[in-house]
């Protein structure tokens, strides 16, 4: 089996002008320390690390310049400096060296995404777990609604006003949904609704079937019993509201380094946001806008409206280069971008092949 190609990374913004070698070296050291420990670093420590060496006084002057440029800040008076989100962005776009995927990581991804004897749902859930494990953050895998043609649809009564809809795809996948129906729907209406839809399946996808059935029902509603029509409409409306399946694993890792109540509240808000339908649609839009792996820092993605959170996302494409999902990692701003980007890229390529 051919392996996915090496990572492809597209920077989000051009490298800012006016950053000299000395400033770049100091910013790099500060961001790398932040990624590794989360702690600020001072001029004395930097003076010992930098080659060629600079005096602490010179380093303090450069740090002050970087702070005025909005790239650094001091968490409190006596501390060293930390990078701002703008500083992290500059580092990612112009200073970061992306590592190659190790053979160990490649073998781990290959084995964990082995599809033999497993469902697509299991594989996608496993993909989000492995992303979380390799990134020490939360792994995201979004699979949009399948475009497979339909084989069978069935409606089963569960109780007053509740019906189970069973959707069988030509690829063998089975999807179950519970819908609400008007009271008093008899079993005969459920059978008629199933027969009506099954007689029109042909080689249609769910989207194609939905368009055809709605057009026919608008033109010849009098031919259907009112309760039968309501069952059909409820089923179609349920699938309309579904943008896909989002797998999120490793949320607990986002809480590992949090001590402040304010940050804890932010992460809880993030958890709530991840469960919304809007998040799924936005993830697909972000993936659609990306040729390769894309990094969003803080509010850049437009999804969460909060600082201190970064997201790395890539589209999963099939052999025809059609987007069939989105793969990503979400975590604190001090993610290990150099390691995570090739992991996300390779996983996206593998998942794209599986979903394709």
Curated annotation (Swiss-Prot):
<dbReference type="InterPro" id="IPR029016">
    <property type="entry name" value="GAF-like_dom_sf"/>
</dbReference>
<dbReference type="InterPro" id="IPR021153">
    <property type="entry name" value="HrcA_C"/>
</dbReference>
<dbReference type="InterPro" id="IPR002571">
    <property type="entry name" value="HrcA"/>
</dbReference>
<dbReference type="GO" id="GO:0003677">
    <property type="term" value="F:DNA binding"/>
</dbReference>
<keyword id="KW-0678">Repressor</keyword>
<protein>
    <recommendedName>
        <fullName>Heat-inducible transcription repressor HrcA</fullName>
    </recommendedName>
</protein>
<keyword id="KW-0346">Stress response</keyword>
<keyword id="KW-0805">Transcription regulation</keyword>
<comment type="function">
    <text>Negative regulator of class I heat shock genes (grpE-dnaK-dnaJ and groELS operons). Prevents heat-shock induction of these operons.</text>
</comment>
<dbReference type="InterPro" id="IPR023120">
    <property type="entry name" value="WHTH_transcript_rep_HrcA_IDD"/>
</dbReference>
<dbReference type="InterPro" id="IPR036390">
    <property type="entry name" value="WH_DNA-bd_sf"/>
</dbReference>
<dbReference type="GO" id="GO:0045892">
    <property type="term" value="P:negative regulation of DNA-templated transcription"/>
</dbReference>
<comment type="similarity">
    <text>Belongs to the HrcA family.</text>
</comment>
<dbReference type="InterPro" id="IPR036388">
    <property type="entry name" value="WH-like_DNA-bd_sf"/>
</dbReference>
<keyword id="KW-0804">Transcription</keyword>
<dbReference type="Pfam" id="PF01628">
    <property type="entry name" value="HrcA"/>
</dbReference>
């Amino acid at each position: 089996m051919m392996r996915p190609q090496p990572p492809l990374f597209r920077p989000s913004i051009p490298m800012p002008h006016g950053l000299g070698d000395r400033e770049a070296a100091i910013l790099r050291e500060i961001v790398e320390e932040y990624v590794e420990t989360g702690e600020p670093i001072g001029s004395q420590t930097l003076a010992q690390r930098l080659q060629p060496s600079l005096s602490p006084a010179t380093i303090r002057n450069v740090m002050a310049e970087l702070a005025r440029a909005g790239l650094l800040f001091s968490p409190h008076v006596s501390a060293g400096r930390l990078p701002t989100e703008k500083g992290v962005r500059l580092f990612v776009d112009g200073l970061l060296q992306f590592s190659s995927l190790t053979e160990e990581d490649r073998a781990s991804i290959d084995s964990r995404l082995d599809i033999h004897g497993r469902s697509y749902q299991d594989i996608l859930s496993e993909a989000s777990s492995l992303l979380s494990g390799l990134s020490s953050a939360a792994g995201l895998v979004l699979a949009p609604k399948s475009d497979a043609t339909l084989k069978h649809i069935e409606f089963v009564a569960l109780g007053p006003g509740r019906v189970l809809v069973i959707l069988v795809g030509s690829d063998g996948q089975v999807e179950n949904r519970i819908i609400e129906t008007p009271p008093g729907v008899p079993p005969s209406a459920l059978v008629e609704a199933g027969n009506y839809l099954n007689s029109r399946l042909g080689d249609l996808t769910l989207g194609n079937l939905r368009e055809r059935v709605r057009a026919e029902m608008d033109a010849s509603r009098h031919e259907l019993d009112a309760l039968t029509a309501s069952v059909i409409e409820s089923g179609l409306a349920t699938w309309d509201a579904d943008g896909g399946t989002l797998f999120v694993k490793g949320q607990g890792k986002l809480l590992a380094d949090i001590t402040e109540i304010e940050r804890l509240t932010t992460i809880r808000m993030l958890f709530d946001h991840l469960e919304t339908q809007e998040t799924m649609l936005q993830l697909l839009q972000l993936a659609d806008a990306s040729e390769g792996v894309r990094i969003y820092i803080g509010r850049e993605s437009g999804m969460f409206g909060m600082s201190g959170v970064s997201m790395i996302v890539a589209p999963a494409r099939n052999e025809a280069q059609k987007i069939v999902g989105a793969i990503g990692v979400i975590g604190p701003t001090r993610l290990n971008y150099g390691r995570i980007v090739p992991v996300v890229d390779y996983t996206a390529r593998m998942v794209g092949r599986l979903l394709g």
